[in-house]
């Protein structure tokens, strides 16, 4: 655990990020509440089917942005300020380039992709309506989510939080106008999100136009090594954002097989609520990333470990509290979304089962963030992409044997398995990279050589 002298710095990074992550999630839930009560189960199911494609937009920005932000922070910590600014400018250039193919994909292939993701009949129509407007703002969304880590890593965590909060408030206001007042349904929810992103983009652009933050043309100079390094580190954050949608798709398909459209609508409610716990934990993990990366770049390796251990305690506590709250409110929560009586019964049974997994989710996801914050792309990617593979295996296997009950239980089994893998990787990481478990100088020298290489 960190000492008292570090608590202020720790909270300076973690609290605004956690608030921003959580409020963004709550605004998404408001989308679901409006659509669920106005359109009904098919509207909820449609957004649930479409969301993996929207998550691709978020993942593209998050992966590139976080990869570049980690490099920038490590360079800043090692004293290479010019290199840090180059990493920032190069990341913005990459965000611009990668936003183009993602936008074209959503514009021209939304319907066939939604069909592959489990959409059919009216559910498919609702999914396409949602994406039809949302895709128009996709380039802005890539830029926004990619630049937020850069802003946080430059120490302006409150500014990043304000940008997220303003976007969310505008989203809620236009949700009411478009979905409720104008009765535009799921298309209105998409339009509200798109307009909110336009406003958020103005705040992001204003930040980088400030005198102290303005970048020169030399900072946007393409660099193949920096390009490759950013993508390598960004693989895990990309996966953290996108691959949970593999969970959604896998559970949607299996829920449809073993419980019909009612089970799919029930899982839409569950995924909204579970998302709150995920974002609280991810806020702790990613909120502390700038601090971890800077300390790692400066060679303060024992402090890095203390921050990580503090994250474990906080994240696991959040998981335990989430389990208690979801269990206590398992019958009330479905009514917020206008769920049918049949869907409510499924949610009431499944919610505590799935919430149990979040005790282990804290360990696995803090570990993932810790690995990429310390320039260990291999460890972070193994956990992220291993989770996706395990979800498919456990869901299909347990669903085949135990039906719908097995589908819900697969999430817990996945996180328990990953927690064991994370513990093994953490032990190896401490031995090989940080050198914290050995007094031999060779271990420490190797760690410092790695830091120096990352700073170049």
Roles of regions detected by a PLM:
Residues 1-17, 72-139, 181-235, 292-357, ...:
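Short alpha-helical transmembrane segments in multi-pass integral membrane proteins
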Residues 44-104, 141-160, 266-329, 361-375, ...:
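Small-residue-rich hydrophobic transmembrane alpha-helices
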Residues 56-59, 103, 171-176, 201-205, ...:
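Hydrophobic transmembrane alpha-helices of multi-pass small-molecule transporters
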Residues 65, 133-152, 160-171, 189-202, ...:
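Short runs within selected transmembrane alpha-helices of multi-pass transporters and secretion channels
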């Amino acid at each position: 655990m960190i000492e008292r002298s570090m608590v202020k710095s720790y909270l300076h990074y973690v609290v605004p990020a956690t608030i921003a992550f959580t409020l963004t999630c709550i605004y998404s839930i408001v989308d679901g509440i409006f659509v669920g009560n106005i359109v009904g189960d098919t509207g909820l199911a449609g957004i649930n089917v479409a969301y993996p494609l929207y998550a691709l937009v978020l993942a593209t920005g998050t992966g590139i942005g976080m990869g570049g932000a980690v490099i920038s922070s490590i360079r800043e910590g090692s004293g290479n300020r010019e290199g840090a600014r180059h990493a920032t400018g190069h990341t913005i250039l990459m965000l611009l380039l990668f936003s183009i193919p993602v936008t074209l994909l959503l514009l021209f292939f939304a319907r066939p992709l939604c069909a592959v993701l489990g959409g059919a009949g009216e559910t498919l129509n609702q999914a396409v309506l949602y994406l039809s407007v949302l895709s128009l703002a996709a380039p802005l969304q890539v830029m926004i989510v990619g630049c937020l880590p850069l802003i946080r890593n430059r120490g302006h965590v409150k500014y990043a939080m304000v940008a997220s909060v303003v976007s969310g408030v505008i989203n809620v206001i236009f949700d009411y106008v478009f979905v409720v007042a104008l009765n535009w349904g799921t298309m209105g929810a998409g339009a509200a999100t798109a307009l909110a992103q336009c406003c958020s983009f103005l705040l992001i652009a204003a930040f980088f136009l400030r005198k102290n933050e303005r970048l020169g043309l030399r900072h946007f100079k393409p660099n193949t090594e920096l390009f490759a390094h950013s993508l390598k580190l960004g693989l895990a954050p990309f996966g953290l954002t996108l691959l949970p949608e593999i969970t959604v798709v896998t559970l949607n398909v299996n829920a449809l097989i073993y419980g019909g459209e009612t089970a799919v609508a029930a899982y839409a409610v569950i995924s909204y609520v579970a998302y709150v716990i995920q974002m609280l934990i991810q806020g702790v993990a990613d909120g502390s990333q700038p601090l971890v990366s800077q300390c790692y770049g400066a060679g303060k390796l024992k402090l890095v470990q203390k921050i990580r251990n503090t994250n474990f305690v906080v994240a696991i506590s959040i998981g335990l509290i989430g389990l208690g709250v979801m269990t206590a409110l398992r019958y009330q929560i479905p009514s917020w979304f206008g769920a049918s009586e049949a869907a409510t019964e499924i949610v009431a049974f499944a919610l505590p089962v799935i919430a149990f997994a979040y005790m282990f989710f804290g360990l696995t996801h803090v570990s993932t963030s810790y690995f990429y914050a310390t320039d260990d792309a291999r460890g972070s990617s193994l956990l992220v992409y291993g989770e996706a593979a395990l979800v498919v295996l456990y869901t299909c296997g347990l669903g085949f044997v135990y039906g719908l009950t097995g589908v819900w239980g697969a999430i817990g089994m996945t996180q328990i398995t990953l927690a064991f893998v994370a513990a093994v990787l953490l032990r190896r990481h401490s031995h090989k990279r940080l050198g914290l478990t050995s007094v031999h100088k060779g271990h420490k020298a190797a760690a410092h050589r790695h830091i120096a290489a990352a700073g170049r």
